[in-house]
């Protein structure tokens, strides 16, 4: 197995953050849940204690506190999505309702700690508590709070995320115009933070920046897609590559092809994860120094690749959930040394006031798994050279070491603020990397060939094939080395010498990937599909129709998606280089009966906040009481709504509509954030097409208590809340009472186009 393949395997295996909180033992799962079968793991590891005491990463006199903290369960933390206009309303709801109910509450004799804000996270948008998932699930006193967390998490308004993992995105200092690469993104909690920062201004539907989120594990990429979809952004692309050889992309700039350099790069590399001992209990028995020794090379390759793709003046954050200097300072020191001044560590000591951290260390030793220590490379016997590398040791030259300013690195210790262990370093790029300084400018096709065939010395030194004669197999399908494949194709197309190449015949293209996703097909300007949509919704002339795409090349287009202009540029110029898993948000869905209503496509709730600024018709302004009725009843008659809403609805033809609630600043008791909903104007009624969890979110924000049971009539309210809105009758639906057994409402609800994301809140559609 080659080094690159081994690296991919290590990236997939070393994922400590996936462990369930508090999973301390194994066993068989019965009706009552996971039950015993294995002895509980003893939270002791003498080698671990010996190693870190010798390295002195913990201040003198604090070792006992450090170990005690590691043996305690990790507090639960949650983060409120900051870019959404509803963030203040959620925070108000949490502080004044749910948190107050937790005061003086005890569960199994343990006093429940009222959640407290993280002192260093801006605007009180992150909170922590001693409530574990186990307690939240089993305690009836916490049922409402648990349902709130589950529902709001699914809606994208709240994220369950470990406190220390929130730090790297904050230190990236992202602005809406930044091009961002997240190199090892799954499961996606940090990625969602980056998306939030791009959309800091909710009035701008398409910020200039974007996030390309990459992960080496194909299955985990779909977890990443699920996380990103909760935020409904047109500026996120999920790709599947080996981070250590992620392809260099190109973009079109005024008709010329130029290399894409990123303004911000998050390099949260795979690690041994000994900082996660509080939640990943297996680390106690499995920890050895061998894990760090094996991962060091991969971490350095990923960091180097990130530095190559960083724009001058850009910022890269390198982070691990490990306390080991072999994975931390050693990687940074080696990267700084090989950069020859192109990179420098930024001083971020004042950027997160309230965060407690220890400065990076400048001296460390290397220990083998059997406890043998080495202070420098010269002392390592030849038999150990495959396991221990010279880059694992600190630089010998004291002046060079001092110039690196390794003390600017941040190491977070668990006992200082009741968190996990973590390491962060912020790097700024001052100039091109030494091996990239003579990079040719790209001009047309010949320049593409030159760029693709000139690989960096980093590729050479890390044992990667750099010319076609070194490719091992005609069916090479590596998940990241697409530059090599591109170079091979160019050489073949140009008739260059190919002696010794074990490749396909010249008439065939090299296979880049093992399999392909559905294509991303942009809708051409002259497509007859768009004019009826444009007319029906009176779209603004500024609407970027060129950014619409579908996922099929044949048959009827059932879903229309949208990406930002910048991501469109990336997609069009790199379709053969990238393995794209997902991008874009759904904005329109085909309605089977749409032709009867002048437009075959209805609006999708997923993309309504992106689309709404461009829509000039089919908009009904509703009151807060109207919103309550629309979200708690399936097909309320016009007469159940306010007279203002009725007068607007009666003048509209049947079909898809936008329902807009504007807050009333004169009424402080009313909901103070705007709401935009997708709906359908039927013959005599209106219905909404809003996912269940999103419905529950809006109802909670309006002060309605929602229960979690699924009943035939849909969302169930408490008696007190139901009295304020009126319950729908249980015997027949509104559509049947209106004499519409085959109404468009019913056909729409039963249409196969109605996906889970657009389905009303778990209700049975009218038949």
From Swiss-Prot:
Pfam families: Methyltr_RsmB-F, Pre-PUA_NSUN2, PUA_NSUN2. Residues 719-730 have a biased composition (Polar residues). GO terms for molecular function: mRNA (cytidine-5-)-methyltransferase activity; RNA binding; tRNA (cytidine-5-)-methyltransferase activity; tRNA binding. The keyword Acetylation applies. Changing residue 139 to E: Mimicks constitutive phosphorylation and abolishes methyltransferase activity. The modification Phosphoserine is found at residues 139, 456, 473, 593, 724, 743, 751. One of its GO terms (cellular component) is mitochondrion. The active site is at residue 321. Its main location: nucleus. Phosphorylated at Ser-139 by AURKB during mitosis, leading to abolish methyltransferase activity and the interaction with NPM1. Disulfide bonds: none annotated. S-adenosyl-L-methionine binds at residues 184-190, 215, 242, 268. Changing residue 271 to A: Abolished mRNA methyltransferase activity. Keywords: Acetylation, Cell cycle, Cell division, Cytoplasm, Cytoskeleton, Differentiation, Disease variant, Intellectual disability, Isopeptide bond, Methyltransferase, Mitochondrion, Mitosis, Nucleus, Phosphoprotein, RNA-binding, S-adenosyl-L-methionine, Secreted, Spermatogenesis, Transferase, tRNA processing, tRNA-binding, Ubl conjugation. The keyword tRNA-binding applies. GO terms for biological process: cell division; hair follicle maturation; in utero embryonic development; meiotic cell cycle checkpoint signaling; mRNA processing; regulation of mRNA export from nucleus; regulation of stem cell differentiation; spermatid development. Its EC number is 2.1.1.-, 2.1.1.203. Residues 1-36, 436-481, 719-767 are annotated as: Disordered. It is found in: Nucleus, Nucleolus; Cytoplasm; Mitochondrion; Cytoplasm, Cytoskeleton, Spindle. Inhibited by magnesium ions. PROSITE patterns: SAM_MT_RSMB_NOP. It catalyses: cytidine(48) in tRNA + S-adenosyl-L-methionine = 5-methylcytidine(48) in tRNA + S-adenosyl-L-homocysteine + H(+); cytidine(49) in tRNA + S-adenosyl-L-methionine = 5-methylcytidine(49) in tRNA + S-adenosyl-L-homocysteine + H(+); cytidine(50) in tRNA + S-adenosyl-L-methionine = 5-methylcytidine(50) in tRNA + S-adenosyl-L-homocysteine + H(+); cytidine(34) in tRNA precursor + S-adenosyl-L-methionine = 5-methylcytidine(34) in tRNA precursor + S-adenosyl-L-homocysteine + H(+). Interacts with NPM1 and NCL during interphase; interaction is disrupted following phosphorylation at Ser-139. Belongs to the class I-like SAM-binding methyltransferase superfamily. RsmB/NOP family. TRM4 subfamily. This is RNA cytosine C(5)-methyltransferase NSUN2. It comes from Homo sapiens. The gene is NSUN2.
């Amino acid at each position: 197995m080659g080094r690159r393949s081994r690296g991919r395997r290590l990236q997939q295996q070393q994922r400590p953050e996936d462990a369930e909180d508090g999973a301390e033992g194994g066993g068989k799962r019965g009706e009552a849940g996971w039950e015993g079968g294995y002895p509980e793991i003893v939270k002791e590891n003498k080698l671990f204690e010996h190693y870190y005491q010798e390295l002195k990463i913990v201040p003198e006199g604090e070792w006992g506190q450090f170990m005690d903290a590691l043996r305690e369960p990790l507090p639960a933390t949650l983060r409120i999505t900051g870019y959404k206009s509803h963030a203040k309303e959620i925070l108000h709801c949490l502080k004044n309702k749910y948190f107050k109910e937790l005061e003086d509450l005890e569960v199994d004799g343990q006093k429940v700690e009222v959640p407290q804000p993280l002192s260093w996270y801006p605007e009180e948008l992150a909170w922590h508590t001693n409530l574990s998932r186990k307690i939240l699930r089993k305690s009836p006193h916490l049922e409402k709070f648990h349902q709130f967390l589950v529902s709001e998490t699914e809606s994208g308004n709240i994220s369950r995320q470990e406190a220390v993992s929130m730090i790297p995105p904050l230190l990236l200092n992202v602005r809406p115009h930044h091009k961002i690469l997240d190199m090892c993104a799954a499961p996606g909690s940090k990625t969602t933070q980056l998306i939030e920062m791009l959309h800091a201004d909710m009035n701008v539907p398409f910020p200039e920046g974007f996030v390309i989120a990459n992960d080496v594990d194909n299955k985990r990429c779909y977890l990443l897609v699920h996380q990103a979809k909760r935020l409904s952004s047109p500026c996120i692309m999920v790709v599947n590559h080996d981070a250590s050889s992620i392809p260099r992309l190109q973009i079109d700039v005024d008709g010329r092809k130029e290399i894409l350099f990123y303004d911000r790069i998050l390099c949260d590399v795979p690690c041994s994860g000994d900082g996660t001992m509080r939640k990943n209990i297996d680390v106690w028995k499995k920890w050895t120094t061998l894990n760090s020794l094996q991962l060091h090379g991969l971490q350095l390759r990923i960091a180097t690749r990130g530095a190559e793709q960083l724009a001058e003046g850009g910022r890269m954050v390198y982070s691990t959930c490990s306390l080991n200097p072999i994975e931390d300072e050693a990687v940074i020191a080696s990267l700084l040394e090989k950069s020859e001044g192109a990179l420098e560590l930024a001083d971020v000591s004042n950027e997160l006031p309230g965060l407690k951290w220890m400065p990076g260390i400048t001296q460390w030793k290397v220990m083998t798994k059997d406890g043998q220590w080495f202070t420098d490379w010269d002392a390592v016997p030849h038999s150990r050279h495959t396991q221990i590398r010279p880059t694992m040791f600190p630089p010998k030259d004291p002046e060079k070491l001092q110039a690196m300013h390794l003390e600017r690195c941040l190491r977070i210790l668990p006992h200082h603020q009741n968190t996990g262990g973590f390491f962060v370093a912020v790097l700024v790029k001052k100039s091109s990397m030494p091996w990239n300084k003579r990079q040719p400018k790209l001009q047309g096709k010949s320049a593409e060939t030159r760029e693709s065939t000139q690989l960096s010395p980093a590729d050479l030194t890390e044992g990667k094939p750099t010319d076609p004669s070194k490719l091992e197999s005609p069916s090479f399908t590596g998940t990241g080395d697409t530059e090599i494949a591109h170079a091979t194709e160019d050489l073949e197309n140009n008739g260059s010498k190919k002696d010794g190449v074990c490749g396909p015949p010249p008439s065939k293209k090299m296979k880049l990937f093992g399999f392909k996703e559905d294509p991303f097909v942009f809708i051409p300007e002259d497509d007859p599909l768009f004019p009826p949509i444009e007319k029906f919704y009176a779209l603004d002339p500024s609407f970027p129709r060129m950014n619409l795409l579908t996922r099929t090349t044949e048959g009827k287009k059932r879903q229309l998606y949208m990406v930002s202009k910048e991501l469109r540029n990336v997609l069009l110029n790199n379709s053969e280089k990238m393995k794209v898993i997902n991008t874009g948000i759904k904005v329109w869905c085909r309605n089977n009966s749409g032709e009867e209503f002048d437009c075959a496509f209805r609006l999708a709730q997923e993309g309504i906040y992106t689309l709404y600024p461009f829509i000039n018709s089919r908009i009904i302004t509703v009151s807060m009481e109207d919103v309550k009725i629309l979200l708690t009843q399936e097909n309320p008659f016009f007469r159940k709504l306010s007279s203002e809403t009725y007068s607007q609805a009666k003048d509209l033809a049947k079909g898809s509509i936008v329902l807009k609630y504007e807050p009333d600043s004169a009424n402080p008791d009313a909901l103070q954030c705007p709401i935009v909903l997708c709906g359908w104007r039927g013959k005599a009624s209106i219905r909404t097409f809003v996912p269940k969890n999103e419905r529950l979110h809006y109802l909670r924000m309006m002060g309605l208590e929602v229960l979690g049971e699924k009943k035939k009539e849909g969302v169930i309210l408490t008696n007190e809340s139901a009295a304020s809105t009126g319950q729908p009758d249980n015997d027949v639906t509104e559509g049947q009472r209106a004499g519409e057994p085959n109404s468009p409402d019913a056909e729409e609800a039963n249409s196969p186009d109605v996906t889970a994301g657009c389905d009303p809140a778990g209700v049975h559609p009218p038949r």
